[in-house]
Swiss-Prot record:
Domain KEN: 589-723
Entry annotated with the keyword DNA damage: no
Description of how the protein assembles with itself and partners: Monomer (inactive form) or homodimer. Interacts with ABCE1; this interaction inhibits the RNASEL.
Species this protein is from: Homo sapiens
Gene that specifies this protein: RNASEL
Designated name of the protein: 2-5A-dependent ribonuclease
Involvement in disease: Prostate cancer, hereditary, 1: A condition associated with familial predisposition to cancer of the prostate. Most prostate cancers are adenocarcinomas that develop in the acini of the prostatic ducts. Other rare histopathologic types of prostate cancer that occur in approximately 5% of patients include small cell carcinoma, mucinous carcinoma, prostatic ductal carcinoma, transitional cell carcinoma, squamous cell carcinoma, basal cell carcinoma, adenoid cystic carcinoma (basaloid), signet-ring cell carcinoma and neuroendocrine carcinoma.
Domain Protein kinase, residue spans: 365-586
CDD domains assigned: RNase_RNase-L
Effect seen on changing D541E: No change in enzymatic activity
Function in brief: Endoribonuclease that functions in the interferon (IFN) antiviral response. In INF treated and virus infected cells, RNASEL probably mediates its antiviral effects through a combination of direct cleavage of single-stranded viral RNAs, inhibition of protein synthesis through the degradation of rRNA, induction of apoptosis, and induction of other antiviral genes. RNASEL mediated apoptosis is the result of a JNK-dependent stress-response pathway leading to cytochrome c release from mitochondria and caspase-dependent apoptosis.
SMART domains: ANK, PUG, S_TKc
Length: 741
């Protein structure tokens, strides 16, 4: 809403002295409001002072000041003279929000009648309801609740602040931190406040209460929150739990009450690897340390005895020794070196600090050790039986967890899937431990983008996609699953640049529905283009495009044909990848060139036996589109063509514009180009494999398509893995493509 200023100066020239007088009157108006001088306010308004004037520093108007003073009469006077009831201060606060801070129900009613929104907020996300909780204004809080205020609204802050994990607090957290016991009771008992709502840093109201510098009501507030089911294992800044914060407050009563909670994790550590017991020893808190020891705190969490000795606390030393603390505590070796370079620093830190073991697993749910977010928690660094692993967290018993573990257990022998090391359960969560890789495919392509050099092969794309194809092939044939979520974030690259398939929480045990396999193949087709394009087209954009549009975006014939075959796999969809691993896309340029030479070396081609099977197969069909090699003799370097035709000069049997003669030409040139007498010819052509790839970009695919299901495929390079999994369905052992593949 625009500011409504009913006291604008009359149009026309004004003297500088007049302007100065007007500005002075504006400042005097604010001063008069602050001094609660109603008569002077009236006089200045009638004299032309700007009722919506905002002072420079905070953007306060006369109305804001009147609301702050709870002067309802001055507020009404200003409104009658055109004060804007929704004008914001520089921090975004409106008169309505300030009325909640002042605790004036009458002013809150007034501004609601003037168009205020009960849930409007300032630029930092504070609503009137939150401010009433912050300042302990019970009547205002109850009034706003009745008028529809959102009790559990989380503070929405600026985007840059949100990236720093600031904001997200609720009115309950504010009341807990400020020590307003009555407000807290009302919020919990009458208004249904969520006791375990968390701010953007993951802190609940219990953490906020323990962060308060005022300890007078902290015990009462803590008891109240615990009685309403507050989570005692939540973490605040630097990973501190309520128990650790209570120890830092040196508050024996709080520690006692927290230890009475059924699910308290007594050995949890903060981000520095310190437990509540270690902190109690460092802070020389004998009674708290003794209480923790009696409640079962691990004494294997640091050099407790030496710390107590350095503090000259002999009685604490005796307590610690009586509970099993070691005199000769040996921390992890300082010279330990991680295998992972990307995660090395965090792994060294995790290796160094104390963490209570969960079965065979050591890990820490903390931002410092987080690899990625997931729908059920996240993926973290960890050690499983001292092996570096990625730990994927699930809610125990969730369908996603069951699918992930079931699929991983069936794939233990497959090298192109992440290795499954084991899992552990704890506090209603399942922790699944798999191969720790360096980065996702998406992150890897960010590094490789722009590396393409003209006239050079893309070995990276070929190798990565070969690994991905083998992984999906293993998943389909050996494991009997379909993935259902193939995307760049689920392809991981290890320290040796090998690709591994991961994230099986959407995978399905294949029961014969070809559509499930086709879904994987279509995603693979998009992954092919994504990798070839080095991620320059986002996978989300590729998913939004039709299959035909994706095919047309292909940069070369091999890529185009491979994607087309993935989109149209034919009847035997489950066998498709077995054959596509032998597709020309995966051949080196030298292999493509060698294949053309080998086919051209067939005797029926060399002798132009026109009725032969191979020349019949290579003959273009009547409905086929034109090819780059239709008039191939005109596209070869003129000098080279003359030189090669010279051999047939006596018989007049020159090369003709047929596929067979082109293959014979490639064979003959390959046999002789390295001879000394053909040195000049090689200078003109350069590398023959590159020359023919560029001159006839569709030739290899043409030959492959014509000969793939014939005996002449013997000339194709053998790229299949010797341990290729066998299909347990029909046709899997033949090694031949299905009609559609």
């Amino acid at each position: 809403m625009e500011s409504r200023d009913h006291n604008n100066p009359q149009e026309g020239p004004t003297s500088s002295s007049g302007r100065r007088a007007a500005v002075e009157d504006n400042h005097l108006l604010i001063k008069a409001v602050q001094n609660e001088d109603v008569d002077l306010v009236q006089q200045l308004l009638e004299g032309g002072a700007n009722v919506n004037f905002q002072e420079e520093e905070g953007g306060w108007t006369p109305l804001h000041n009147a609301v702050q003073m709870s002067r309802e009469d001055i507020v009404e006077l200003l409104l009658r003279h055109g004060a804007d009831p929704v004008l914001r201060k520089k921090n975004g606060a409106t008169p309505f929000i300030l009325a909640a801070i002042a605790g004036s129900v009458k002013l809150l009613k007034l501004f609601l009648s003037k168009g205020a929104d009960v849930n409007e907020c300032d630029f930092y996300g504070f609503t009137a309801f939150m401010e009433a909780a912050v300042y302990g204004k019970v009547k205002a809080l109850k009034f706003l609740y009745k008028r529809g205020a959102n009790v559990n609204l989380r503070r929405k802050t600026k985007e840059d602040q949100e990236r720093l994990r600031k904001g997200g607090a609720t009115a309950l957290m504010d009341a807990a931190e400020k020590g307003h016991v009555e407000v807290l009771k009302i919020l919990l008992d009458e208004m249904g406040a969520d006791v375990n709502a968390c701010d953007n840093m993951g802190r609940n109201a219990l953490i906020h209460a323990l962060l308060s510098s005022d300890d007078s009501d902290v015990e009462a507030i803590t008891h109240l929150l615990l009685d309403h089911g507050a989570d005692v294992n939540v973490r605040g800044e630097r990973g501190k739990t309520p128990l650790i914060l209570a120890v830092e407050k040196k508050h024996l009563g709080l520690v006692q009450r927290l230890l009475e909670q059924e699910h308290i994790e007594i050995n949890d550590t903060d981000s520095d690897g310190k437990t509540a017991l270690l902190l109690a020893v460092e802070l020389k808190l004998k009674k708290i340390a003794e209480l923790l020891c009696k409640r079962g705190a691990s004494t294997d969490c640091g050099d407790l005895v030496m710390t107590a000795r350095r503090n000259y606390d002999h009685s604490l030393v005796k307590v610690l020794l009586s509970h099993g603390a070691k005199e000769d505590f040996h921390p992890p070796a300082e010279d330990w070196k991680p295998q992972s370079s990307h995660w090395g620093a965090a792994l060294k830190d995790l290796h160094r600090i104390y963490r209570p073991m969960i079965g065979k697993l050591k890990f820490f749910i903390d931002e410092k050790y987080k690899i990625a977010d997931t729908s059920e928690g996240g993926i973290y660094l960890g050690f499983y039986e001292k092996q570096e692993v990625a730990v994927k967290t699930f809610c125990e018993g969730s369908p996603r967890a069951q699918r992930e573990v079931s699929c991983l257990q069936s794939s233990r022998e497959n090298s192109h899937l992440v290795t499954f090391y084991g899992s552990e359960s704890h506090r209603g969560h399942l922790f699944v431990c798999v191969t720790l890789c360096e980065q996702t495919l998406e992150a890897c392509l960010d590094v490789h983008r722009g590396e393409d050099v003209e006239n050079e092969e893309d070995e990276f794309a070929r190798n990565v996609l070969s690994s991905i194809f083998k992984a999906v092939q293993e998943l389909h044939l050996s494991c009997g699953y379909t993935h259902q979520d193939l995307q760049p974030q689920n392809i991981l690259i290890d320290s040796k640049k090998a690709a591994h398939l991961a994230d099986f929480d959407k995978s399905i045990k294949w029961a014969g529905d070809p559509q499930e396999v086709k879904r994987d193949l279509e995603d693979l087709g998009r992954l092919v283009l994504y990798v070839v394009k080095k991620g320059s087209i986002s996978f989300e954009d590729l998913k939004a495009q039709s299959n035909e549009e994706v095919v047309q975006l292909s940069p070369d014939e091999e890529t185009k044909d491979l994607i087309h075959r993935l989109f149209h796999p034919g009847e035997h969809v489950r066998d498709c990848l077995s054959d596509l691993l032998g597709h020309p896309f995966f051949w080196t340029w030298e292999s493509r060139y060698r294949t053309l030479r080998n086919v051209g070396n067939e005797s029926d081609i060399k002798t132009r036996k026109s009725e032969s099977e191979i020349l019949r197969l290579l003959q273009p069909g009547p409905s086929e589109h034109s090819k780059s090699f239709d008039k191939w003799t005109t596209k070869i370097n003129e000098c080279v063509m003359k030189k090669m035709n010279k051999f047939y000069e006596k018989r007049g049997n020159f090369y003709q514009n047929t596929v067979g003669d082109l293959l014979k030409f490639i064979r003959n040139l390959g046999e002789h180009i390295d001879e000394e007498k053909h040195k000049k010819m090689k200078l003109k052509i350069g590398d023959p494999s590159l020359y023919f790839q560029k001159t006839f970009p569709d030739l290899v695919i043409y030959v492959y398509t014509k000969l793939q299901n014939t005996e002449y495929r013997k000339h194709f390079p053998q790229t299949h893995s010797p341990n290729k999994p066998q299909c347990d369905g029909a046709g899997g052992a033949s090694g031949l493509a299905s009609p559609g593949c």
